[in-house]
Amino acid sequence: MALNLMAKKAIVKQVNSLAKVSVSVGVAEYCGLTVEQMTNLRSSAIDANVTLRVVKNSLAKRALVKTECECVFLVLSGPIILGFSQEDPGAVARVFKNFIKENKNLVVKGLGVSGEFVKSNQLQRIADLPTKDQAIGITMTLMLAPVEKLVRTLIEFPTKVTRVVSAVCD
């Protein structure tokens, strides 16, 4: 059933508002996926805070104009699904990568991360980016290491003195 003009404008507005608040967008061709596979993809996307939208290419191009997601224009062809992530730049890539492990019919065409286009062959690199919580944990570990070493060094001196005195007494 064809969409009327008002419905098309509503879709463009929804996708545009979604694109404006997203830090990354993924474009994948879903040709050959069954309904069950598509449902699994959508549920894994929901778990990862990724919004998936199936949109006609002409409407997607109109919606992505003047947003950071505009960089994916070149790959908007064929039956596509757009994945938007508002929090984690690597979330869309991780969802697509994990889904492709079991379903070879999903073909990732490219990713847009902070206004930069990333080719599909670099999906693994983006998917391996740490999440915000992981990055904070790594940073805190790196910051605490010198402090822990200093504390161990300061504690070691009295321990050595005690051992020397104990050895002399024996």
UniProtKB/Swiss-Prot annotation:
One GO term (biological process): translation
Full protein name: Large ribosomal subunit protein uL10
Assembly and interaction partners: Part of the ribosomal stalk of the 50S ribosomal subunit. The N-terminus interacts with L11 and the large rRNA to form the base of the stalk. The C-terminus forms an elongated spine to which L12 dimers bind in a sequential fashion forming a multimeric L10(L12)X complex.
Role noted for this protein: Forms part of the ribosomal stalk, playing a central role in the interaction of the ribosome with GTP-bound translation factors.
Cited InterPro entries: Ribosomal_uL10 (IPR001790), Ribosomal_uL10-like_sf (IPR043141), Ribosomal_uL10_bac (IPR022973), Ribosomal_uL10_bac_type (IPR047865)
MF (Gene Ontology): large ribosomal subunit rRNA binding
Gene3D superfamilies in alphabetical order: 3.30.70.1730
Lipoprotein in keyword set: no
